[in-house]
Design a protein with these regions (language model features):
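A short glycine-rich beta-alpha junction/loop motif
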Residues: 45-52, 83-109
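Hydrophobic residues in beta-strands and at strand termini
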Residues: 4-6, 40, 57, 100-102
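Short, ligand-facing micro-motifs at secondary-structure edges
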Residues: 1-3, 22-48, 53, 63, ...
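Short, solvent-exposed alpha-helical surface patches in well-structured domains
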Residues: 64-67, 77, 97, 107-111, ...
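Sequence-specific dsDNA recognition surfaces
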Residues: 1-22
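Amphipathic alpha-helical coiled-coil/heptad-repeat segments
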Residues: 102-155
Length: 155
C-alpha cells in the first residue's frame, strides 16, 4: 500500500518504522523468501505490515543485523528449520535455535560500513552492466529487424 489514511496512521505507532530500524518478515509463501528483511535508512514514514517484526534497538547495529539476516549462513539455518505447506512461519522456537555472530557494537558498525561501501560499488557495476545488456539487446533486435525487412542485405 503506497498511501495510508491519516486516521490509520494516528493509531499505527506500533507499526511505524523509523530510520535505523530493522524489519524482518516472520512468514513467507516460499522457502526462498524465509527470513526476508530490510534496514530502513530513510526518514520517510514507513509502516510495517502483518507478519513483520520491527527490531528497534540501540544495543545492536540494526544495519549489521540486516546484513547478517541476508547472509546465506543465517538464511540456511532458518530454511532448514521452517515447515509449512502454503506458508512458512519463523517461530520464536526457530529463532532460539539459530546461531548468529554478534561481535561488539564497534565491530558491527565497522562491518556494516565496510559492506555499505563494497556493496555500493558492486551495485554500481551491476547497474552499468544492465545498461550495456539493454543496449546490446536493442542492437540485436534492430539488427534482426533490419535484416528480415531487407534494410540490410546479407548477400
Amino acid at each position: 500500500i503506497r498511501f495510508i489514511p491519516r486516521e490509520l496512521a494516528k493509531n499505527g505507532d506500533s507499526a511505524l518504522v523509523k530510520q535505523g530500524d530493522f524489519i524482518f518478515a516472520d512468514t513467507s509463501e516460499d522457502l526462498e523468501g524465509c527470513g526476508n528483511c530490510v534496514y530502513n535508512d530513510t526518514t520517510n514514514p514507513i509502516y510495517a505490515g502483518y507478519h513483520t517484526i520491527i527490531y528497534k534497538t540501540r544495543e545492536r547495529d540494526c544495519k549489521y543485523l540486516a546484513y547478517l539476516f541476508r547472509s546465506n549462513v543465517w538464511r540456511s539455518q532458518i530454511r532448514c528449520r521452517v515447515s509449512g505447506i502454503k506458508v512458512y512461519s519463523i517461530t520464536q522456537g526457530i529463532m532460539s535455535q539459530v546461531n548468529i555472530l554478534l561481535p561488539p557494537m564497534s565491530e558491527q558498525k565497522e562491518i556494516s560500513t565496510y559492506l555499505d561501501t563494497k556493496c555500493s560499488k558492486i551495485d554500481h557495476i551491476i547497474a552499468t552492466q544492465k545498461k550495456k545488456i539493454a543496449y546490446l539487446q536493442e542492437l540485436k533486435q534492430s539488427l534482426i529487424t533490419n535484416v528480415v525487412t531487407g534494410k540490410i542485405k546479407v548477400s
